[in-house]
């Protein structure tokens, strides 16, 4: 049937809170005026007009009252929960724990990141009829402003790939209902800067559902978010939001930096029974930014899956420098991977670079092991540095690796500005880059 829109004015008939009773600020005339429009009274009248008798309605009322009393008594008499279970059910268990499939098939060809994501979703939709894609401009006519959903609408039809209104709260919040009826939604917010209207749904619904239901109602969904500064996008199309996302417990956050990781993480995110936010740097989509050519990769086979929570060493230091204690470890993600690798070229063999790939869950085992090996560490982010995820991670790792550190763990991020400027010179001044990273490496190695 067609959907119905109900536009109703509903009066407040009860107390606002137990401490602010209705009689404090409303007189009898006002209360009676609104009680005349009480939906329960109206429903009662409608049922009588429809032929239901008062005695039948009384039986229904008594049955409802009895059921409520039974449920209340059962809740009161229930045993107190075991305090040791307080951290249970933050996430539902994922079936993907090991890397699977062929990452670099011999017959494969190189693809850009945006296509790797597209191909992953196409394979998922071919295999799983419950997969559905929707968001702003992702339908067949445009296929996404970055062509990240191109051809999906033509291939799978408007009932599985469709546009939504410019309403991020709906895009995010609707996934809870979709998941409840067995659909696996893959949705998109067009730019990271526009995600904030959807945060209420991420916080109050998606992140809490598994925990509050004791694991009965996790919400499997993927929220794709193009992110990062690229080509003078300005204050409303260049933002980074990972620290804000990571303050929400109960969601997972991934941030691939190359096409192979993008495809593998997209597959793992789909099979994960929890909400997953996939941050996709616009500057890496097509490898058009100088120095990002390695974001193009051989397209992994259709069976390739990369589990969440596994960081990757993308550049290793030379063993001789390592033995002399003359190396530095850079921990980064997204565009930071390419800034770090370019900067490392000025210090051959002295720099190791780790790509986090997943920000939550995070691969603390690898990070602590490598920091203890190197003794010096720089955490690199595109976000404004102060109060960032990177600073929080630095604090955690400093405590865990304090004895083995040769210097305080350093953090490098963007300037603490409220927005990314549109002017390219100002954008460059605000953000990290390879030159700035190289200067920081030099200080770590030589001061």
Language-model features: locations:
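A structural signal for alpha-helix termini and helix-coil/disorder junctions
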Residues: 49, 74-81, 92, 123, ...
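Residues in well-ordered alpha-helical elements
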Residues: 84, 260-263, 365, 435
